[in-house]
Amino acid sequence: MSQYWSQLVHTLTPYVPGEQPKVDNLIKLNTNESPYPPSPLVLNALSSQLNDKLRLYPDPSSEDLKQSIATYYGVESNQVFVGNGSDEVLAHAFMTLLKQDKPILFPDISYSFYPVYCGLYEIEHQTIPLTDDFKINPADYNIENGGIIFPNPNAPTGRLLPLQAIEQIVQQNASSVVVVDEAYIDFGGESAAQLVLRYPNLLVVQTFSKSRALAGLRVGFAIGDKALIDGLERVKNSFNSYPLDRLATAGAIAAIEDEPYFQQSCEKIITTRDTLTHFLEDNGFEVIPSAANFVFTRHSEMRAEDIANQLREQAIIVRYFNKPRIDQYLRITIGTEEENTQLCRALTDILKTQNA
């Protein structure tokens, strides 16, 4: 705390990112990173950028990347916005589209960065409770609002909202913007990006961090009506005209181009997720149906925090949330098959000790 802080800084409650321990031989299942490396095409693309052009600023519009994303999703490049990770894209969306004279809406159990943005930009918000089984009810969002945002699949629950339900929310809120945060959509869902051509109030945000294994490069993007994108560009260019460096841009383009590798990685993660889900359900855990690269689970007889602590003793880190409604749940990132096997062995040992 400092006497030189502005009044706003004193009111902020910053986002707390998942732990990034600097320890070798650790099974890290707490931040939903890909267990697999980036495509070889990405590594080649990065190497090709290590030359004297690094002395020059990158393209401020990242036009080549926008065109690659537009082609992939069947939209025009002027319907694509890119940023330094989807968190930056979301931050610009809050400032550009959600700072209105009415409260914005988002689920009570959701991405914990949303209330942080509201605090930073002084945006009034209202949380809408999920159902008892952690579902979003579209009818609950048919109230007066200054905008709506939610992840799909939701985080940290992993539940998927069907495309038809998303369309219902967008239709019944034609006078405000609906932002769908699709960080995990590639692990079992259908992207709402296909709806942006029909709905000018829909913005879809995605990231290269999860399914394309580029969390270390920080590349995110949004797809929406040209008018929405124009607004995002105005805010971006009032903040940082060069959010993506040359390496990040080249790596992201290469990741899009290697579709077979992308599909193979997603399929392996989905298969391992199914294997882990079956194991957990066979051993006294309740598992929320997941369409993400993680599972959200609780045990009928053991406290979630105790399980997390005992896993840590075996060099396995999972995510525990000390928050109302979810303080008995763990979020477990899907690792490699080998990591999954070690996790299951560790859980088996913990449960045996509990039942001894």
Curated annotation (Swiss-Prot):
CDD domains: AAT_like. The keyword Metal-binding does not apply. Its EC number is 2.6.1.9. The modification N6-(pyridoxal phosphate)lysine is found at K210. Gene3D superfamilies: Aspartate Aminotransferase, domain 1 (3.90.1150.10), Type I PLP-dependent aspartate aminotransferase-like (Major domain) (3.40.640.10). One of its GO terms (molecular function) is histidinol-phosphate transaminase activity. Pathway: Amino-acid biosynthesis; L-histidine biosynthesis; L-histidine from 5-phospho-alpha-D-ribose 1-diphosphate: step 7/9. The keyword Ribosomal protein does not apply. Its cofactor is pyridoxal 5'-phosphate. PANTHER family: HISTIDINOL-PHOSPHATE AMINOTRANSFERASE, HISTIDINOL-PHOSPHATE AMINOTRANSFERASE 2. HAMAP family: HisC_aminotrans_2 (MF_01023). This is Histidinol-phosphate aminotransferase 1. It comes from Hydrogenovibrio crunogenus (strain DSM 25203 / XCL-2). The gene is hisC1.
